[in-house]
Amino acid sequence: MDSITHLFLGGAIVAAIVPARHRRAALLAGAALNTLPDLDVFPLALCDDPIVRMTWHRGATHSWLVLPFVAWAIWAWFRGRGGRVAEAPTRWWWAILACLMAHPLIDAFTVYGTQLFWPLPMPPLMWSSLFIIDPLFTLPWLLACVVAWCARERILAQRALLAGITLGIAYVGWSLLAKSLVERAARPALVALGLRDAPSFSVPLPFNTLLWRVVAMTPDGFVEGERSLVADHGPMVFHAHASDTQALDAVSQLPAVVRVLWFNHHFAKAQVRDGTLVLSDLRMGSEPDYSFNFAVATRTGNRWQALRPPRQLPFVWKSRPGLDALWSRIWNQPPPTQ
C-alpha cells in the first residue's frame, strides 16, 4: 500500500495494544515502524538495473521469516533503554511485532507482489484485491488515529482505534468478496473463449473496489476485460491483444527475463520496438499503457543480445482524463458490444 496508509495503519495498531498512557507515543512509534519495511527502496535506488530494483523490493524487508527477529531487536533495544517499553514490555512486544507483520500482509493484498516468505524459492504473493492507493481503505485508519491523538487516554480513543481496525479489516473482506463476484462473472466468458484453464488474474482499477480488470493469457497474447459491479449486469466482454510470443521464447533464458517473469507470474506482454524487445507487466496498467516496461534485448540479425543493464521505459499517466474516465466507467458505461 501507499506510505500514507502505512503511517496510519501502524499508528492505529500500536496505539490499540499499548497502555493508554503511552497512546500518543504509540501513534508516532507505529507510524515509524510500519514505514520501516519500505526503506529498502533507498539501497535499491543505488542499483542501475530496474528489474533488480523492482523484483527485490518487498523482499527480505517484507518477509514474515525475517521480521520477527527485527521486531525482537527493536523491542530489546528500547526495553534496555528504559522508558515506556520497559514499563509495559509485553504489550510493547506484541505491538511492535503486530505492526511490522501487518505491513507486508496488507501489501500482499495488492497486485505488485510481496515475498512474504523470503528467502523460500516461491513467487511473490499477489492476492490483488486492493489497489495500492485506496482512499476508502485509508480513511478508517486515519480517522482512528486522529481521534486517538485528540482523546489521549480517554476510552473514546480506544473505541475509535478498535472501530478503525474493524472497519479496515471489513474493507479488506469486502474487496475479496468483490473480487470473487468479478471472477464469477468472468468465468463463463472465458470458458466460451476456450480459456477455462488459462492463467488469469483480476485486479481493481485505481482508487476503488467497484471497477475491475480481468486478464487471461492466450497462446498468442492475452484477453482483457473490465467489470463494474455497479453498471455491468450482462455477459462480460473481453478484447484480444497480441504479444510477440516468438520473440519472448527466444530470450526466455536471459537472466533478466527469467527474473521478471518469475516476479509477475508470467503475466507479461512482449513487443518489438525498433529492434528492441520490450516486456510490459500486464498486472499494472491496462492496454496499451503499463506502469512497468523494460527493454531487455536488442536484435542483431537473427539473434537477440541481452541489454545489460535492462532499461525501464518512462510511463506517463494522464491523471485528469484518466480519473474522469474511471469515474464515468464505474457508474455509467457498460462494456461496448462486440
Language model: regions and residue ranges:
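N-terminal membrane-targeting hydrophobic helices
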Residues: M1-P204
